[in-house]
C-alpha cells in the first residue's frame, strides 16, 4: 500500500493546522494588545502609603469646575486654591513616624516677581510674560541646608535635584481635567508622598505648578528666572493631550533618565512617539521642549494622548475621565520621581556649561517600549546599533555558509531546476527538480495586497477622509481583510498553477532580504540622526532570520540530488488539449518546466474514457489518465512517477498535494517553530506602534493635518503586521479568507458612506471673534474641516440672511460673519474704543524710535501688531536671558504682552528701520490688540454661546487663538 500524507497530524503543514494555529496565535496576541490600549488598570482598593486617591479625585473636581485660562478671573481663584492646598498638605504631614524618621523641610514660593521677554515661533514674534507660578521645594537629605536661593547669585552646593512640572491653566474652551488637571493633582499627591516620614528624597525635589502653558509655554520659560531653577538637573513633565486612558511616556532625554520610569507598575509608550514629535507629526508642544531644550535639563514627558477630539473642549472634564486614569499617571509619576530623587550617582551632574544651561551632564540615546503595558524595555541606542550591525553581518554569512554546506552535501535543491543522473553523458538533460518554482511569488504576494491597501487609502481620503475620526477600527478591518484575502488568493492561484514545496522557504528568504534592507536603513538613521523608532526591524529580522535558517537546515533531510536522480524513471511528457500546464505533480516524472507546458495531442474520446476509469495502485502512471481540467486551461496531473518502469511498485505519496516528490523527506512540524519565531515578535512590537499611531493621529485631520498620511501609515503597518503570514498562507483553508472578503465588502461600503462624526467623537470647530474698536464692527470666525464648518456657520441664527464668507485656501478653512457684539467689560461701556487705550511718544532725537504705553480694560493680555517688522523692542522692567533671545535678524512683527495684574499698562520701546522719504524718516503703523478669554459666564460672549447652543451634537468648540475675543485699534507713528 502507498504511504499517505498524514492529514491528522495536529502540527502538520496542512490546511487545518495552519489555519487554526496561525489564527489562534494572532488572536491570542491582538486581543491583549487591544485590551492594553483601551482598558486602564484599576486603581488600588486602598490608598498606598503616602497617597490619597480620594483626595486627589476631589481636588480634580474642584480644579475643573470652570474654564481657567491665564487671562481669566477663574485662573486667579485656582491660584489661591492651589496655594491653600499646598499648605494644607504640608501642615498635615505627621511630625515623625514610628521609625523616628523626620519629614523633610519644605519651602513654598508664590512667584509674583519673575518676568521674561523672549522670541516665539518664526522669530518674528516677541513675548513678554509675568509669572504667577507656584514652586514647592522639598529639601533632600543630602542637600545644602542653607537658603542659598536668598542670594541673587546663590548656587546650590548639593547634587542636582529633580523637578516635577505641571501647568494649572486650561484653555478658554476646556475644563482641563487631563490638560493638565491630572498632572496638577498628581503633583499635590507627590508633595504629600515625599513629605510623609520615611519617603524623604535623597536629592532635592522641586514641584512646579506653572501658569501660562497654553499660551506658548510661557510659564515654563519664566520659571527659568526663579532662583530654584538652578537646582534641578532632571525633570518629570506631566501633561495631557487627550482626555483619559493611559498616560504614555511621550519623550525622554536619554537612557539613564528613562530607567526609573521602568519602575512604574504599568509603563506605557514607545520611543517612536518621540520620533513622531521630532518629525512634526503632532503640532502641539509641551513644557518638555523648554525644560530639555532651552534649560538643558534631562527628563521625561508623560502625557495622556487620546481621544484628541476631547482635547481643548468642554469634554475635557472629570466626567469623561476616571480615577483609574488618574492612578495610572500618579503611579508612574511616583515611581519615576522616586527613582530620580533616590539616585546616589553622579550621572546627572556635569561640568558647568558656557551656554548657561544646567550642568546636568550628558546621557546616552535611549530605546524604550512597553510590553503589554506591564514591563518597559529600555536600553541604549548604541547597543541597538551594535546588535544591528552584528545581525546585518552574521545573518547573511550564516545563510551563505549553510547554503555552501548544502551544496557540498548535494542537498541544495533551492534554485535548482534539474539534477544530473550519475554516469550520464553530457547531452543528458537531467531529471527535473522544479526547485525554482515559487521563487517569484513573494513580489506578487507583497505588492498586490499592499498596492490595493494604498489604493484604498487614497480612495477613502478622496471620498470620506474623516471617517477614521470616529471609526478607526472599521478602517483597520478594511485594510487587513483586503490584504489577507488578496494574499491568500494570489498564493492559491500560484500554488494551483505551479505547486511548489519551496513556497515557504522562498517567501522567508525574500522576507529576510527585505527586512535586511530595512534594517540597513534603520541603522543608518540610528547612527546619523539618533532615531530609534526603527528598533522593531531588528527584532523582526532576528525572527525571520531564524525561521529562514530553519528552512535551509530542513534541506539536510532531503535525499542527495544524485541519489534522487538515479531513482527517477526516464522523463515523459504529458499534454492536454485544453492548453499548457504550468505546474505538474510530484517531480518524479523527470519533466522539466517546458515539458509541463506542451499540448496534448490525444483525442477527446480517449481522455473521456480515461477519466471514467477507476484508477488503482497498479494503474499505469504514463497513460495520461488522472488528469483534471482546471481554470485558465491548465491541467493538473495527478499521477506519480515510479522508480523504474514497472507498474507494480508502490508509489511515493508522502507529499502534499501536487508538490514535488522529493519534498516527502521535509519535516512536517517545523513550520510551527518558524511561525512562532517570525510572527509573534512583529505583533508584540509593531502592534502597539500601530495602535499608538492610530490613537495619536486619527483625529488630527480636524487640526489641519493631512488625513492621507494616517491612511497610508495604516496601509504600511497592515503590511508589516500581516507579512509574517505569507510563508504559510497558501495552506489556508478558504473559510477565513472568504469571511474576510465579506468583512472587506461591508467595511469598504461603511467607510465610504458613513458620517464621520458622533457625539462621542466630535468635530472640533475653532472660534474667534474680532472687534474693530474704532468702528465697532465685529466678525465671528469658525475654523474647521470643510464643508462641515460652512454648514454649521450658516445654520446659526445670527448668520441667517448674511453672506457667510469662507477662506478655503488654508489647511484649516475659516468662515466668518457679522456676529453678536461681545460684552466682555465688567461694566457697560458704550464706546468700544475705551476697551483699549494706548499712547505713542516718538523720540525727538531718534526719529526711528517710539515708546508705546498700552492697556486694556478687564484683561491682562494685549499685543502690538506691526504692518512691517520692527528692528528691536524692549519692555520696561523686563528681564532678559541669553538662553531665550528676544530679537531676530528678520525683525519682530508682533509683540505679545502678558501681565499678572488686571488692567495693567505695559511700556514698550520700539525701534524700526524704514528708508527716509523726501529727507524725512517714515514711521510705523499697525494695530494695538487686546484679548478677552473668560467664557465662564453666559452672555459675556454671545456669539460663542450661540455656537455652543445651536451647533450640531457632533461638533465641539475650541479656541482659535489665545483670546476668544480680540479687540483692536489702528495706530500710525
UniProtKB/Swiss-Prot annotation:
The active site is at 213 (proton acceptor). SUPFAM superfamilies: Zn-dependent exopeptidases. It is found in: Vacuole membrane. Residues 574-587 have a biased composition (Polar residues). GO terms for cellular component: vacuolar membrane. Its cofactor is Zn(2+). One of its GO terms (molecular function) is metal ion binding. The keyword Protease applies. Zn(2+) 1 binds at residues 167, 179, 239. Belongs to the peptidase M28 family. It is a multi-pass membrane protein. Binds 2 Zn(2+) ions per subunit. Zn(2+) 2 binds at residues 179, 214, 312. Its EC number is 3.4.-.-. GO terms for biological process: proteolysis. It comes from Aspergillus clavatus (strain ATCC 1007 / CBS 513.65 / DSM 816 / NCTC 3887 / NRRL 1 / QM 1276 / 107). Residues 37-383, 460-469, 526-529, 696-708, 757-973 are vacuolar. This is Vacuolar membrane protease. Residues 1-15, 405-438, 491-504, 551-674, 730-735 are cytoplasmic. Keywords: Glycoprotein, Hydrolase, Membrane, Metal-binding, Metalloprotease, Protease, Transmembrane, Transmembrane helix, Vacuole, Zinc. InterPro entries: Fxna-like_M28_dom (IPR048024), M28_fam (IPR045175), Peptidase_M28 (IPR007484), PFF1_C (IPR053975), PFF1_TM (IPR053976). The chain crosses the membrane at residues 16-36, 384-404, 439-459, 470-490, 505-525, 530-550, 675-695, 709-729, 736-756.
Amino acid at each position: 500500500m502507498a504511504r499517505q500524507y498524514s492529514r491528522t497530524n495536529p502540527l502538520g503543514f496542512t490546511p487545518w493546522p495552519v489555519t487554526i494555529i496561525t489564527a489562534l496565535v494572532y488572536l491570542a496576541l491582538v486581543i491583549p494588545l487591544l485590551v492594553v490600549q483601551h482598558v486602564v488598570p484599576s486603581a488600588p482598593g486602598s490608598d498606598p502609603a503616602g497617597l490619597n486617591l480620594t483626595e486627589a479625585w476631589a481636588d480634580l473636581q474642584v480644579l475643573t469646575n470652570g474654564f481657567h485660562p491665564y487671562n481669566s478671573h477663574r485662573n486667579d481663584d485656582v491660584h489661591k486654591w492651589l496655594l491653600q492646598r499646598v499648605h494644607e498638605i504640608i501642615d498635615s504631614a505627621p511630625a515623625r513616624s514610628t521609625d523616628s524618621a523626620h519629614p523633610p523641610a519644605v519651602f513654598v514660593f508664590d512667584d509674583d516677581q519673575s518676568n521674561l521677554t523672549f522670541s516665539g515661533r518664526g522669530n518674528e514674534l516677541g513675548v513678554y510674560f509675568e509669572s504667577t507660578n507656584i514652586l514647592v521645594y522639598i529639601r533632600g537629605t543630602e542637600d545644602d541646608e542653607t537658603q542659598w536661593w536668598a542670594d541673587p547669585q546663590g548656587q546650590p552646593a548639593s547634587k542636582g535635584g529633580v523637578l516635577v512640572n505641571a501647568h494649572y491653566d486650561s484653555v478658554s474652551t476646556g475644563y482641563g481635567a487631563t490638560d493638565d488637571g491630572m498632572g496638577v493633582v498628581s503633583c499635590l499627591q507627590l508633595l504629600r508622598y515625599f513629605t510623609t516620614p520615611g519617603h524623604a528624597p535623597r536629592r532635592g525635589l522641586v514641584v512646579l505648578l506653572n501658569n501660562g502653558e497654553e499660551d506658548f509655554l510661557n510659564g515654563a520659560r519664566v520659571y527659568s528666572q526663579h532662583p530654584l531653577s538652578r537646582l534641578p538637573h532632571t525633570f518629570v513633565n506631566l501633561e495631557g493631550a487627550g482626555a483619559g486612558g493611559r498616560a504614555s511616556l511621550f519623550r525622554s532625554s536619554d537612557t539613564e533618565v528613562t530607567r526609573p520610569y521602568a519602575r512604574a507598575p504599568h509603563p506605557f509608550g514607545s520611543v517612536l512617539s518621540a520620533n513622531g514629535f521630532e518629525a512634526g507629526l503632532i503640532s502641539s508642544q509641551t513644557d518638555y521642549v523648554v525644560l530639555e531644550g532651552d534649560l538643558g535639563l534631562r527628563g521625561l514627558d508623560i502625557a495622556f494622548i487620546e481621544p484628541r477630539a476631547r482635547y481643548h473642549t468642554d469634554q475635557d472634564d472629570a466626567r469623561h475621565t476616571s480615577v483609574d486614569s488618574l492612578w495610572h499617571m500618579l503611579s508612574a509619576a511616583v515611581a519615576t520621581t522616586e527613582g530620580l530623587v533616590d539616585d546616589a550617582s553622579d550621572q546627572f551632574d556635569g561640568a558647568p556649561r558656557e551656554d548657561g544651561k544646567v550642568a546636568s551632564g550628558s546621557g546616552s540615546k535611549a530605546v524604550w517600549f512597553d510590553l503589554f503595558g506591564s514591563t518597559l524595555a529600555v536600553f541604549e541606542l548604541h547597543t541597538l546599533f551594535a546588535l544591528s550591525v552584528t545581525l546585518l553581518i552574521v545573518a547573511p554569512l550564516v545563510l551563505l555558509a549553510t547554503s555552501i554546506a548544502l551544496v557540498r552535501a548535494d542537498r541544495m535543491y533551492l534554485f535548482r531546476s534539474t539534477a544530473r543522473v550519475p554516469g550520464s553523458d553530457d547531452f543528458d538533460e537531467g531529471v527535473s527538480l522544479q526547485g525554482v518554482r515559487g521563487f517569484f511569488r513573494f513580489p506578487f504576494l507583497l505588492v498586490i495586497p499592499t498596492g490595493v491597501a494604498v489604493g484604498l487609502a487614497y480612495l477613502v481620503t478622496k471620498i470620506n477622509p474623516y471617517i477614521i475620526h470616529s471609526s478607526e477600527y472599521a478602517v483597520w478591518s478594511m485594510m487587513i481583510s483586503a490584504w489577507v484575502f488578496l494574499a491568500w488568493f494570489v498564493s492559491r492561484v500560484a500554488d494551483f498553477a505551479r505547486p511548489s514545496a519551496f513556497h515557504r522557504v522562498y517567501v522567508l528568504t525574500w522576507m529576510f532580504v527585505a527586512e535586511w534592507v530595512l534594517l540597513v536603513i534603520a541603522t543608518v538613521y540610528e547612527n546619523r540622526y539618533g532615531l530609534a523608532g526603527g528598533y522593531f526591524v531588528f527584532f523582526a529580522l532576528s525572527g525571520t532570520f531564524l525561521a529562514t535558517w530553519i528552512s535551509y537546515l530542513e534541506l539536510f533531510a532531503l535525499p542527495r540530488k544524485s541519489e534522487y536522480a538515479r531513482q527517477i524513471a526516464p522523463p515523459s511528457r504529458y499534454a492536454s488539449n485544453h492548453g499548457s500546464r504550468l505546474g505538474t505533480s510530484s517531480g518524479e516524472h523527470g519533466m522539466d518546466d517546458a515539458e509541463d507546458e506542451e499540448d496534448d495531442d490525444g483525442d477527446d474520446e480517449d481522455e473521456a474514457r480515461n477519466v471514467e476509469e477507476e484508477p488503482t495502485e497498479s494503474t499505469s502512471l504514463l497513460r495520461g489518465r488522472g488528469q483534471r481540467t482546471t481554470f485558465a486551461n491548465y491541467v493538473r496531473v495527478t499521477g506519480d512517477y515510479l522508480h523504474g518502469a514497472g507498474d507494480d511498485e508502490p508509489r511515493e505519496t508522502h507529499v502534499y498535494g501536487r508538490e514535488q516528490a522529493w519534498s516527502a523527506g521535509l519535516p512536517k512540524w517545523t513550520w510551527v517553530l518558524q511561525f512562532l519565531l517570525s510572527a509573534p515578535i512583529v505583533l508584540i512590537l509593531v502592534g502597539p506602534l500601530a495602535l499608538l499611531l492610530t490613537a495619536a493621529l486619527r483625529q488630527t485631520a480636524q487640526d489641519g493635518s493631512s488625513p492621507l498620511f494616517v491612511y497610508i501609515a495604516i496601509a504600511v503597518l497592515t503590511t508589516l503586521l500581516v507579512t509574517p503570514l505569507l510563508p504559510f498562507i497558501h495552506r489556508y483553508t478558504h473559510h477565513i479568507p472568504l469571511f474576510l472578503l465579506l468583512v472587506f465588502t461591508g467595511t469598504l461600503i461603511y467607510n465610504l458612506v458613513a458620517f464621520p462624526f458622533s457625539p462621542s467623537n466630535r468635530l472640533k470647530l475653532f472660534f474667534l471673534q474680532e472687534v474693530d474698536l474704532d468702528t465697532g464692527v465685529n466678525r465671528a470666525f469658525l475654523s474647521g474641516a470643510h464643508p462641515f464648518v460652512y454648514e454649521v456657520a450658516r445654520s446659526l441664527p445670527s448668520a441667517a440672511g448674511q453672506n457667510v464668507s469662507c477662506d478655503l485656501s488654508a489647511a484649516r478653512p475659516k468662515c466668518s460673519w457679522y456676529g453678536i457684539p461681545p460684552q466682555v467689560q465688567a461694566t457697560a461701556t458704550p464706546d468700544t474704543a475705551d476697551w483699549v487705550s494706548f499712547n505713542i511718544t516718538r523720540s525727538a532725537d531718534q526719529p526711528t524710535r517710539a515708546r508705546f504705553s498700552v492697556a486694556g480694560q478687564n484683561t491682562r493680555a494685549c499685543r502690538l501688531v506691526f504692518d512691517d517688522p520692527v528692528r528691536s523692542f524692549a519692555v520696561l522692567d523686563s528681564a532678559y536671558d541669553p538662553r531665550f533671545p528676544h530679537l531676530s535678524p528678520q525683525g519682530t512683527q508682533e509683540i505679545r504682552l502678558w501681565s499678572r495684574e488686571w488692567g495693567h499698562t505695559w511700556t514698550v520701546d520700539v525701534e524700526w528701520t524704514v528708508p527716509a522719504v523726501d529727507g524725512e524718516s517714515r514711521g510705523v503703523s499697525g494695530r494695538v490688540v487686546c484679548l478677552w478669554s473668560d467664557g465662564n459666564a453666559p452672555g459675556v460672549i454671545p456669539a460663542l454661546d450661540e455656537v455652543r447652543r445651536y451647533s450640531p451634537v457632533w461638533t465641539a468648540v475650541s479656541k482659535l487663538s489665545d483670546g476668544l475675543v480680540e479687540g483692536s485699534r489702528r495706530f500710525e507713528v
